[in-house]
Structure formats: structure tokens, C-alpha cells
Amino acid sequence: STPRLEGFSMPPEWAPHECTWMEFPPANKEFAADPAELAAARATWASVANTIARFEPVRMVCNLGESHISRELLDPAIELFETTTGDAWCRDSGPTFLTHPDGRLGATLWTFNAWGDRGFSDPTDERHVGVFIAGLAGAEVFPSSMVNEGGGIHVDGQGTVICTETVQLEIGRAHV
């Protein structure tokens, strides 16, 4: 079955939601080339998370064994969850949440290939993060064979989809 056939749809950005999900930057090729760069990335992520936490709950996924690092930088109200991670772009590799008129939560799990397997990070470390987050959120899971980055699509809740050409159509990135 598909989310649409089951009555689910992707809500617009401004729709009410329970919380914001984020991933804390792990040491990987993108962030850890220089310890100062990794520290700066972590401080930036923490600043964003701490700002969001002033207005709504934040749930942060941290790489296994690294929650103590994020805890030092994050507001105590931010919930931490540990699992193996490979990157910090939860919007791209995490679930795309869906809503149902009866209040149920769903999640599309795209096939994530780390931006076309360009070597920024190992996509195998990220592919389970969507399942992990969807499980914690209690969402009904809809796996998709479509290679996609969740951050590459936006909807208005009225049937309009805005997508990025580089994500959806770039050969190698989207395996078109």
C-alpha cells in the first residue's frame, strides 16, 4: 500500500507538530577533517537546537557513545537518543512525517544515498536513522524505493509540491 491510499499526506512546514527532530554532527569526512571544524559545526547545531527549544520540544539523535558531547552544548530540555549515525542532515536522511485525518502519524522512508554517494559520509551509517526516528515517534512506516532527500521537497497542504531539480533530476544523485 502507499501513504496516499492509506489516507496519509505530507503536511506543510507551518502545520502544527509535536517537535523538531535533529541529528548532532558526528566525526565524519565532512565535519572532522579538522577538529576545530567539527567543534564549530557542533556549536552551530547546538545553537540552532537551543534556539528552537525555546519555542518547542527538540529531539536530537546522537552518534553512539557521543551523547555526552552533545549534552555539554545542548539545553537540558532537549531529549537525546543514541544510534549509529553517519551525518547530521536529519532533514535529508530522516523520515518525512505524514499525517492522517484521524490523527495517526506516518513516515515515508526514502532511499538515502548520501547526496549521490559523493563521499561526504557513508550512507550505510544513515539509512537506518529514519526507521529509528519513526519508531521513537510511533509513526506508521512507509518504505520507498525512490532515492530522495527529504529536504528536497516541500508542500503547501493544498496539492502543490515544490522540489529541487538537483535532488530529483540530477543523474547519479537521484539515480534517474
Where are the model-predicted features located?
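The feature marks the mature, well-folded catalytic cores of soluble enzymes
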Residues: 1-173
